[in-house]
Each structure stands twice: as C-alpha cells, then as structure tokens.
Amino acid sequence: MRRVIVIVVFSLPLCGSWKALSQTVHSPVSAAYLGLGAYSNNHVDVFSFHPNQAALAKINAASAGIYGEKRFLLKELSLYNVTVALPTHSGNFGLDARYYGFADYNETQLGLAYGRSVGNKIDVGVQFNYYSVRIAGYGNASTVNFEIGTIFHLTDKLNAGLHAYNPVGGKLGKVEEEKLASLYSAGIGYEASEKVFLSAEIEKQEDEPINVNAGLQYKFLRQLLARAGVSTATSSMYLGIGFGWKSLRMDATASYHPQLGVTPGLLLIFAFNKKEQ
C-alpha cells in the first residue's frame, strides 16, 4: 500500500500531470517521438496528429497503431495508446484512446479528430475529447474538452503550425478548484533531404514552464528508420528504431529522465490500402 501512495503522490507531479489546481491528461514520456512527423510531408504516420490534428490531412492510407510504455520501469505508471486514422474524400478522421495508471489510480481519454486541407498551403484539424480520472476511495471525475490546430506549408521542405489543447479551460467533475489545464504549442519541421527530417516544438502548459521538444529522424532504408530528440522541461532524451515490413512497422523506443530513469516503449503501426490520389 505504501508503494501505491508513493507512486501516486510523488510520481505525478514529476511527470507534470497532477497539480493542486490544474491537471492534464498523461501523454507518453516519448510523446515527442510519436508526434515527430506532424510537421513533415514525407514522414507522416497514424500517430502524427497527436500534437496537431491538422496533420491528419496528410495521411493517405487508413492506418491503425498501438503504443505502450512502462514509465520509469514501474507497471503502475504504464500507459497504453490506440490510434486509428481513416482518410475520406471529405477529409480525414482519427480516433485516439489512451489509458494511464493502474487499478487504484488511472486516467482515460477518448478522442475523435478531423483534419483536412484548405487549399494547397494550409491544413486544419480539430479533436473532441472525453477525459476521466479515477482515484480509489475518492471516486471519479470527468470532463469534455477540445483541441484545435493548423499547419502552414511554407515551402516544399518547410512546414510550421499552431496548436491549442483545451483553450477554453473548464472544471474537472464537480470540484470547482480542480480544472483541466490548457496547453499551447507552435511547431516547425524541415525536410533536409529524403532521408533526414528535423522538427522543433515550443509548448506552454498552464502553470508550467516553457518546454521545447527537438527531434531528428533519419531513414537509413525504406524499411529502417531512427529517431532521437530531447525535451527541455525535464531534460529528458528519447531514442527509437523502427523496422518496416510490407504494411507493418514496429518501433522500439526508450526515453531517459535524469532523476527518474528509463522508460521503454513499443509501437506497432499497420497501414491499409492507400486511398486514390
């Protein structure tokens, strides 16, 4: 029981999620890894719309992905994420489901996203979420929120975008003092070559310091890629290797926090037939 209390009370503030007056849904420790392709034209996948729903507009094949991580090697801090993208002639749709925690403390978010191009230079996207948190002995609390984003195609190699999560705020459940925090970000991506992609994102979460995510992807072969990056707010680093075979891709990831240690993760993506261009 003492282990449970220590995990809930001490690990959540260090992860940047539980605060006295505001709370945000847990993202993977390697969230920057999953969303690295958001501001790319050539390296978009089913997870790319996580940091900006406008990235859905560039997904040209129905896809499904699952990601799991054992945060800081503690099973009580495990996170699971299932994502689906469905392109249509009227725009592209996405589904996102996340579960974090264990029996005595857990968070769940279910999201429905939509993204499309507006002309040749701008993509837009929006997502509606149902978020809930449960603490054993204290009950449940839930709320509904939304996030919105846009991506500008400045050149053939350079993209930039803006994103807002829960911009209007709102309380969590019936507790007036507890609310879901807002988060704003601006990102940029540069296609240095067919093999090299660079990305950077600035985030500002309510009541938290500014965070910068910077990442690099290098594609050795069509079937083999590597990603690496850093998040400045926690001085965390991440690294991953992805292997592709036909319509399947598997990535093994790891992130490192200077105080809390290593978080291993595993990602699987399956892409169905591409839609007609």
Question: Where do the language-model regions lie?
Answer:
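Bacterial N-terminal signal peptides
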Residues: 7-16
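Subset of outer-membrane beta-barrel
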Residues: 21-277
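Positively charged n-region of N-terminal signal peptides that target proteins for export
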Residues: 1-4
